[in-house]
Amino acid sequence: MSNMMNKFAEKLQGNDDSHQKGKNAKSSNKERDDMNMDMGMGHDQSEGGMKMGHDQSGTKMNAGRGIANDWKTYENMKK
């Protein structure tokens, strides 16, 4: 899972680099933003996992469906 996120982040940063050649200050700020975004995503995932384990009713299925939707979103953005 983290491998996929790394590739995704690299792709984002690669796109930004091509947009912002020669603007180093802006580029490094953008990279920091991307890192914060990744950390936020990881945080959400672990919280979701805790909720899943906590609540073993129908929530597990919903959480699984949410992950599948995220994967579809990622696949669509990759194109």
From Swiss-Prot:
Annotated Basic and acidic residues bias: 8-20
UniProt GO BP: cellular response to water deprivation
Chain positions covered by the region annotation Disordered: 1-79
Domain of life: Eukaryota
Alphabetized GO MF terms: phospholipid binding
GO annotations of cellular component type: cytoplasm
Extra facts: Present with 2300 molecules/cell in log phase SD medium.
Protein name: Protein SIP18
Originating gene: SIP18
